[in-house]
Amino acid sequence: MATNESGTPFRAISQSQHCPEAWDMVTYAAMKNYGVAFSRLRKSRFRSRFHLSEADRRYIAEKGMATIRRHCEDFIRTRLAPANPPNDGKQTPMRGHPVFIAQHACACCCRDCLAKWWKVPRGVAIPAERQQGIVDFLMAWIERENAP
């Protein structure tokens, strides 16, 4: 049993046991403030090196943004939202789809990156409305990158 500064015992609560508070107060607000979030990501040497290729731009032009959004929703729902995604940390390829590039650029590629950058607790499924926030964030990055 843990104790506080005065020696009073208390039951430690893991971050995953209070997911809504952690998400609502930190992550969702940070992701919705795209300018601040993108500025923060640009300061990372690793994150700032990701950009859409010409092939990615052609793919977006061929498929349209509505299709890219559907792909994004599917990738987030199946590869990122489960409490313990299969192959976590390796589930997002480094190339091959504009959404994959956006996920790495925006630190939304695995649960470890979501936890580190956006305080999304590990081991807790991401609810549908929060998945939509991640999708909106990734699509905003793609739209910025794809702008002429």
Label each PLM-derived region with a short phrase.
Residues 30-76:
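Core of compact, soluble alpha-helical bundle domains
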Residues 132-148:
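Short Fe-S-cluster ligation motifs
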Residues 86-106:
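Immediate flanking context of iron-sulfur cluster ligation sites
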Residues 112-132:
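Iron-sulfur (Fe-S) cluster-binding segments and ferredoxin-like electron-carrier domains
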